[in-house]
């Protein structure tokens, strides 16, 4: 008989990892920061003070940081473009979906400028950009009236079109003979005006000549008679006929 061989199994604990590696926290900015949507796999990370869609720095006019109900923050211009792209008349058309989590946010009746401004990011902006300028929506345009840079100058308006495309131009109306007759009538009226002006000018010229004619005559002839007097015939001496002798009766 062969004696059975006993094998003893000893549990070996797994090697412990370094505590410095296990306890290292993950950066929330690197985990939650979006990447550029145009280049997949790009390592560009959005700054907390710039929009994650257009990568433009926040300001106090059209790039005001607006916070959605999901606490994601984007600039006012990008949110206005998203709101303009929503279908009109459909359920949910009055809400803007978040580009990251797709959670809808109701748009106020005044439009995207009435959305909540992120005071947390606004407090981290430079001091001259913390005062939010009034921006309103006119149709598909974001409008603002910034203060003039020089004193005494009237403030102007600045507008940005956030619509998808420009409205189609109406077709040109077909031409009919009525406008042509209207043009002929206007031309005829102008011609009549010109004839009146010519007639008045001719009358004024005639009156001017009649008024200056005596002056011209006085300068040339020395009197107001323009035609020279006809020369007088020379005086002829008539010989007196001698009286004949008186005849006696």
UniProtKB/Swiss-Prot annotation:
GO biological process entries: protein ubiquitination
Compositionally biased tracts (Low complexity): 17-44, 235-249
Keyword DNA-binding attributed: no
Signal peptide: none
Keywords, sorted A to Z: Membrane, Metal-binding, Transmembrane, Transmembrane helix, Zinc, Zinc-finger
Pfam families according to UniProt: zf-RING_5
InterPro entries with a match to the protein in the record: RING_finger_E3_ubiq-ligases, Znf_RING, Znf_RING/FYVE/PHD, Znf_RING_CS
GO CC annotation, single: membrane
Membrane spanning stretches: 199-219
Protein name, as recorded: RING finger protein 223
Domain of life: Eukaryota
GO MF terms held by the record: ubiquitin protein ligase activity; zinc ion binding
Zinc finger (RING-type): 51-102
Record-linked PROSITE patterns: ZF_RING_1, ZF_RING_2
Region (Disordered) location: 1-44, 230-249
Protein localization: Membrane
Membrane topology recorded in Swiss-Prot or TrEMBL: Single-pass membrane protein
């Amino acid at each position: 008989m062969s004696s059975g061989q006993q094998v003893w199994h000893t549990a070996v604990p797994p090697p412990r990892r370094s505590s410095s590696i296990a306890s290292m926290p993950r950066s929330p900015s690197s985990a939650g920061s979006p990447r550029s949507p145009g280049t997949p796999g790009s390592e560009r990370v959005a700054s907390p003070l710039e929009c994650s869609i257009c990568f433009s720095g926040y300001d106090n006019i059209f790039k005001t940081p607006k916070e959605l109900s999901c606490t994601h923050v984007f600039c006012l211009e990008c949110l206005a473009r998203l709101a303009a792209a929503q279908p009109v008349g459909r359920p949910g058309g009055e809400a803007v979906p978040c580009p990251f989590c797709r959670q809808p946010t109701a748009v106020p009746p005044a439009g995207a400028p009435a959305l909540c401004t992120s005071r947390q990011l606004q407090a981290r902006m430079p001091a001259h950009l913390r005062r939010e300028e009034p921006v309103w929506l006119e149709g598909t345009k974001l409008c603002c009236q910034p203060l003039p840079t020089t004193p005494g100058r009237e403030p102007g308006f600045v507008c940005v079109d956030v619509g998808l495309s420009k409205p189609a131009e109406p077709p040109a109306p077909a031409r009919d003979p009525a406008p042509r007759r209207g043009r002929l009538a206007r031309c005829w009226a102008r011609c009549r005006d010109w004839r009146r002006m010519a007639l008045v000018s001719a009358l004024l010229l005639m009156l001017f000549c009649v008024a200056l004619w005596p002056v011209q005559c006085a300068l040339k002839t020395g009197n107001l008679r323009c035609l020279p007097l006809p020369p007088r015939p020379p005086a002829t001496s008539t010989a007196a006929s001698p009286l004949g002798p008186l005849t006696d009766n």
